[in-house]
A protein has these predicted regions:
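C-terminal interaction module
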Residues: 1-45, 153-345
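Internal, hydrophobic cores of structured domains that mediate oligomerization or house catalytic pockets
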Residues: 38-161
């Protein structure tokens, strides 16, 4: 019997994700990113970008394509993606997603390592130190460090412009959050509850629940996270609804076998409530990028729809094309029926 392959898409792991306003697609950041990963023992060895035709190739033999993925975009492309893998223990993935036109409010950087690495020894502390080094590198507005299964089960789509999504095992809050919450309250949090509160060099803060990150979904840790939310103030949290398990397959949904009202319930949940949000740093840099994009000619609606795999239909209607079958669907009417985006609480 052959050896079972590693499930790169669904492996159990611990994830670090940063939401970054400040553009960080420079050669210096790309080089330092690899240096930090290597320093902590997580050097990747495989690469996939549009410049490798989305194929997985050996990183060291394709460094030009690595930097090109960070620095260049295809004509009319609205984003840049760099995907990395580490195929030896601890195995994991590293992804960079950058809005090339500056219209999306955040860029993303994430690192995921397999769960076994965190079960014993210094792995957890080493990963946390790497996270702090990456925080210093990209100056994010927000970051979370969590067991991946727990993070998926606890929240839906995270929208920082509607408030914090919740408290996770590790929480990086940029200086804008420190200013909004008040450092006195954050210091008191570390005294009153069994959590670690660390002031970061840029006056941001790191809140860690303690214990092992793999236990973050236990009742005790969930209660501790809830206590932190209560202490800081519920008005700062958006309380995004966790995703509901789908009682149907997407194949049946695309085939029109699922009633529109059921699709709306599970695929178009109500918006989360609006919480208090800070004034995010570096917004002027994103605005500058957007202006540069527009001066360069930007992209038409038709080109954007083509870029993401959609097509124009009629006077403004949009259809989605199933790449596997070639069948097209009118959205939202044909699949979801008429309906709004949901009501705020």
């Amino acid at each position: 019997m052959g050896k079972r392959g590693f499930d790169w898409d669904g492996f159990d792991g611990v994830i670090l994700t940063f939401w970054v306003v400040k553009p960080f697609d420079t050669r210096e950041v790309a080089q330092t990113f690899l240096g930090i990963l290597e320093h902590h023992g997580y050097a990747p060895d495989r690469l996939s970008t549009v410049w490798t035709k989305d194929r997985w190739v050996k990183l060291q033999q394709n460094m030009d394509e690595y930097y090109r993925g960070w620095l260049e975009r295809r004509p009319k492309a609205v984003s840049k993606h760099v995907m990395l893998r580490r195929t030896c223990y601890p195995r994991g993935t590293m992804n960079v997603d950058i809005s090339a036109d500056g219209r999306f409010p955040f860029d993303f950087l994430d690192v995921v390592l397999e769960a076994d690495y965190f079960r014993e020894g210094p792995g957890q502390q080493r990963f946390l130190q790497m996270a702090k080094d990456l925080y210093t590198l990209v100056n994010p507005a927000y970051g979370m460090l969590e067991d991946r299964d727990t993070s998926i089960s606890r929240t839906g789509i995270i929208d920082l412009e509607r408030g914090l999504p919740g408290i996770f095992w590790g929480n990086f809050l940029g200086p804008e959050y420190t200013a909004m919450l008040g450092w006195e309250k954050l210091e008191a949090l570390g005294r009153e509850l069994p959590v670690t509160v660390e002031r970061l060099p840029d006056d941001g803060v790191l809140i860690v629940l303690g214990g092992n990150v793999l236990d973050s979904g236990t009742p005790e840790m969930l209660a501790r996270a809830e206590a932190v939310e209560q202490f800081l103030g519920e008005e700062y949290f958006s309380k995004t609804s966790p995703p509901k398990p789908l009682p149907f397959s997407m194949t049946d949904a695309l085939a029109g076998k699922v009633p529109p009202e059921v699709l709306r319930k599970y695929l178009m949940p109500p918006k989360p409530r609006q919480g208090k949000v800070p004034e995010f740093r570096f917004r002027e840099l994103r605005q500058k990028r957007q202006e540069e994009w527009e001066r360069s000619g930007g992209i038409t609606v038709e080109e954007l729809i083509e870029e993401v795999g959609l097509e124009i239909k009629g006077p403004g209607g949009v259809i989605m094309v199933d790449a596997a079958t070639g069948k097209a669907y009118d959205l939202p009417g044909e699949m979801f029926g008429e309906g709004d985006e949901g009501e705020e609480e």
